[in-house]
Each structure stands twice: as C-alpha cells, then as structure tokens.
Amino acid sequence: AGGADISIATIPVGDREAPEFGILKANEENFITSFIEKPKKEILGEWTSDTGAEMQRQGRHYLASMGIYIFNRSLLDTLLKDEYPSATDFGKEIMPNSIEKYKVISYQYDGYWTDIGNIYSFFEANIALTDDIPAFNLFDSSKTIFTRSRMLPPGKISGTTLEKTVVAEGCLIFASRIETSVLGIRSRIGHGTTVVSCYLMGNDYYETLTQMEANTSKGIPKIGIGERCYIKNAIIDKNCRIGNDVRINGGMHLE
C-alpha cells in the first residue's frame, strides 16, 4: 500500500490491552516510525498514534500489530535468505529492524478482531456474544459464520429463566436461572442451579442412563453441572463434571 515495502495490519487498542501487544507508532502518512514489544504501562504515553476520532473516543490510542504482514516479494527473499537466514519470529526479529531500513506502512483495521491469547480476553470475547448487538454478530446474514455441522437434537429447556444467554444445539437445561452466559453443544445443567456470566464449552457426547447409574455408584458426577449449584464468572471446560450443591465464584480475585 502507498509504495510501501512492507504493510502491517494494525488495530487500535486501549491502555489495558496495549502492554500485551507489539505497539507501532505511525506518522501522518501512516508510515511506521518505531516499534516496541509489549511496552510497560509507565511508558505508554510515548506510544500514542492518530487512530482516528472514533477510536480515540473509545480510548483506543495505540496501534497494535495484528501479526499480519504483506511484503514486497523481492524484499521478502532478501530478508529471509540474506539478512535474517536464522530468524524464527517475524514480530521479534525481522520487523523491528525492517522499520528502520525500509518503507513500512500501517493498514489500520477497524472491523472486529480480538486477541484471545489469555484467559481474560478469551472469556470476554465469548461473553460479548450475549450483547444485544455484539461486535461479532453471529446473526449477520451478510457475514455468515460457517462451522462443522452436527446432527444434534434441538435443545430442551424446562423451568429456566434465561436472560442474555446464547444456547447451542443439543442442550438439556433444567436450571433455575441463567444470565449473560454462552452454553456450548450438549451442555447439561441440573434443577435449581444458577449460572451467571459463564462460558460452558459443552460436551462431546451424551451419557447413557446405564453410564450415569454406574458413575453414580462410584461417586462420579454426571457430565455437566449438577443440581442446586451457583456458578459465576467461570469458564467450564468440555466434558466437565460438577456435582450437586457446588458454588463457584470466579474472577480476578483467583489470580
């Protein structure tokens, strides 16, 4: 783009996210002038860029690298074969020095993109699907999301109050209340249970009645969440077994 040797896809981020990314600084023509890998919060003020009025209103003043690069082909050959023949990481080894030697431009992406490289961002990205009109909208027919099709029965829900909840196919839900949560395929939640701000990854299979009885005799809970539980701010892994009368209140205080 713009006669550049290298184009880097960037996305505006805020104060909280910036220390987790490689941050680029761009001039008025969007050419990148400097780069820092995962800057400390104390020096963030030195790394702001003009991200546009809307992004700045949202407090997103920093250009984070998305790890997507477009190279002039001949330059790429030179970089890999001659200048950095033993390099193994574009972001850490090749890009910082290339910014000083070549024309490197920022392509600012303003659509939906999020890094889910840590537990908090992974949790936030999934819970955001429960918003009325989420940034990543699964119901946008012009941007269809395709997944592996499964021949599962429809979900069964009984006696449950649902508020801002996304329910995948094949679920068996008998909980008292579920709010601001995402329930993966084949999720099972027992009577009297409350689930708040949780992501349930679901299950790979259904247990048969025979399997349930055999496991109960050994003191092994059924797959899913049992009865009279209270689960909040949690990520429940696939095929997880949570027995009856369990209370889990997750969050930052557990770190």
Which residue stretches match the model-derived regions?
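Conserved core of the sugar-phosphate nucleotidyltransferase
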Residues: 2-69
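Conserved nucleotide-sugar donor-binding
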Residues: 66-78
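Left-handed beta-helix
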Residues: 53-55, 74, 81-255
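Active-site-proximal flexible loops/turns
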Residues: 41-44, 79, 125
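Conserved, well-structured beta-alpha core segment at the onset of a catalytic domain
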Residues: 1, 5, 80-83
